[in-house]
Amino acid sequence: MQKTVQFKDVSLYTESFGDSNNPALLLIMGAASSLIWWDEGFCNKLVDKGYFVIRYDNRDTGMSTSYPVGKPGYTFEEMSDDAIKILDAYQIEKATIMGMSMGGMLAQMIAIRHPERVKSLVLLASMYFAEGAEDLPVFSPEVQKFFDDYGDYRPIGYRAQVDYAFKQWQATHHSERKYDLDEIYKMIELDVNRAIDYNSKLNHSFALVTGDELTRIKEIGCPTLIVHGTVDNVIPLIHGEMLSKTIPNASLLTLVGAGHELHPEDNDCIVEAILELNK
């Protein structure tokens, strides 16, 4: 089911799966990535286990509000509050919040800003920002080179946008999992085709964090599951380990051989871990 959530000058495109009377699970995707990267197979596995699942396009992705490149009209705090607007629109009092990468950063902020709305937290391939974060490694040399080479690049035209996105996918998906690259290319074509302004996704690198929530994760009181791949070349495993050590009541699910990804091969074990989290 599709629903557009509107408030002020913001429009957020959402999709839901399953029975709205079931426990809710809200999915927040990472930087520059639309909702399609939450695989429908993963969503349906959660539905089969009794969840009502919502995924949505963050601002500047997919069919949600876009802003001129370099001029995002929002902060990350406002992006995190978007999730609450969506819960309100679906009349959901409390949900499991699952975020990947930047979505995990937003999920951490939500758990601090709106603890009464968060039943539990799932952080997939997410970054640690609290005490000692400045000493942790981030991008691998290969990923850093890609962003150094293409950091200011704004592809013009459909084919250039698809080719650029495919190069980015290749640079950031160091993994022992197998992929059908033709299917990935088709996914990227869909991503570009459905976007209001595909280049506006670059705004996630311009948006600012203005509060201190990310340094206060010791205050998170809900059950938390950290999921991280051992060969993640965008946000190394140490970030997941630090999150699990710092957040009270957190557990760590390590995906051996997985990178910065949600791979179908891992769907079952992640879903089972979420079920265990919410027992």
Question: Where are the regions a protein language model picked out?
Answer:
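Conserved HGGG/HGGXW glycine-rich cap/lid loop of the alpha/beta-hydrolase fold
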Residues: V10-S66
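Conserved acidic catalytic loop of the alpha/beta-hydrolase fold
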Residues: E77-A95
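Conserved hydrolase catalytic core segment
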Residues: E93-D135
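Flexible "cap/lid" loop of the alpha/beta hydrolase fold
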Residues: L121-P155
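Alpha/beta-hydrolase
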Residues: P141-D149, Y153-T215, C222, M242
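Short beta-strand/loop motif that positions the catalytic acidic residue
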Residues: I220, I226-H228
